[in-house]
């Protein structure tokens, strides 16, 4: 990042490897804030939505932190990383074991994350 340092806000979803994402942006010269505070998120200039793990667990954490409406109302640029990008769609076929229903996601992008069809291949 050239010139003055850019400020990046990482949304603390509770389901992410935040230290890796933070370190990557700091190496690029960015000033980084990590937060789950809705007021700080709403005022941020640029946002990162990271995620690791499963869609159901991440959405549960985002709901518990009362971040859904805040994230859905953002007008500024948001970069989804890994699971964070997947959570930006309407729903995911990934679900809790024993639950056949799709996981409702953030619905920022119309679409659905589909399971890979492996046709009996081991992955």
Located regions from the model:
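Residues in the short beta-alpha loop(s) of Rossmann-like NAD(P)-binding domains
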Residues: 14, 38, 112
């Amino acid at each position: 990042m050239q010139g003055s340092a850019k400020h990046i806000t990482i949304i603390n979803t509770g389901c992410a490897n935040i230290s890796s994402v933070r370190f990557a942006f700091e190496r690029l010269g960015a000033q980084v804030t990590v937060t789950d505070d809705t007021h700080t998120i709403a005022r941020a200039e640029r946002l990162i939505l990271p995620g690791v793990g499963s869609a159901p667990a991440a959405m549960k954490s985002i709901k518990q932190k009362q971040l859904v409406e805040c994230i859905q109302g953002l007008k500024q640029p948001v970069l989804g990383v890994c699971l964070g990008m997947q959570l930006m769609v309407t729903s995911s076929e990934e679900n809790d074991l024993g639950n056949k229903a799709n996981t409702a996601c953030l619905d920022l992008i119309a679409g659905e994350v589909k399971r890979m069809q492996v046709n009996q291949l081991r992955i």
